[in-house]
Amino acid sequence: MSLKNEKIAVLFGGVSAEREISLNSGKSVFEALQSLGYNVEAIDTKEFPIEKLKEKGIQRVFNILHGGIGENGVLQGALEQLGIPYTGCGVMASAITLDKFRTKLLWNAVGLPTAAMEVVRRGQAVNSDEIIAKLGLPLFVKPASEGSSVGVSKVKTAEQLLPAIEEALKYDSIVLVEENLAGAEYSVPVLDGEVLPAVQIIPDGEFYDYHAKYISDNTQYVVPALNADRQAEVAKLVKQAYDVVGCRGWSRIDVMEDGEGNFRLVEVNTCPGMTSHSIFPKSAATVGYSFERLVERVLELSA
């Protein structure tokens, strides 16, 4: 049966810190599906309860909720309970990958390279000198479970470390303090198990923060960014990382080079942005996907 005969909901918005980005992504996805002739409805989950989707006649979901329940397995579990197929990763992969700490533990357990880190939990005494002695300066401080660089700080001096940790703790009870990786930054999309060309990110500012991602027009995206050998190298690493955490459908994996040019894994985005600034469509375009066809392909991979 053609998916065009089904009633499809684009779930977007929601209540996470990434609501605004999700609203933009949802609008783009909704318009793309509409233009292709799908029977589609845009539903902001802040306004409409998920458990009533079945009553509304919804038969399939395109999930474009960033962060929060849209990416942590809660939505996925609810949709499985309702018997509604959905785009993107399943319950387990969603739950694991929204937690950067546990994602890195898994990768490290199978020998995949990541930045060295220290973990700080809410209420724990922090010894700045000890952390800096171990990881050096500058450092990155980030909440374990937020996306879109919400709550992330670059720390250049010892005095900045505690305030940065306090800021990150506003968003999560677990905070990661990571070594600075001095090399280039890449984001690597995966579509149906196929690794697409890496996109190099040259941020407008100190690092790829919320402003550089969504507001600035001066952040540069270079794609394809790597020669064939380096692309093959990063693709092998990214595919291993994707498989270890159990991703399916589509995801985007962020990677950085260290000072020696070795690739290190950073994090997984199981529900990548689909706005005018977004990385996934930029990469997919280089291998022949229009935005509309990319959206349709993600929908076709729903399960």
UniProtKB/Swiss-Prot annotation:
EC primary class: ligase
GO biological process: cell wall organization; peptidoglycan biosynthetic process; regulation of cell shape
InterPro entries tied to this protein: ATP-grasp, ATP_grasp_subdomain_1, D-Ala_lig_Van_CS, D_ala_D_ala, Dala_Dala_lig_C, Dala_Dala_lig_N, PreATP-grasp_dom_sf
Pathway recorded for this protein: Cell wall biogenesis; peptidoglycan biosynthesis
Cofactor(s) this protein requires: Mg(2+); Mn(2+)
Localization in the cell: Cytoplasm
Any GO MF annotation of the entry: D-alanine-D-alanine ligase activity
Job of this protein: Cell wall formation.
Protein name per Swiss-Prot or TrEMBL: D-alanine--D-alanine ligase
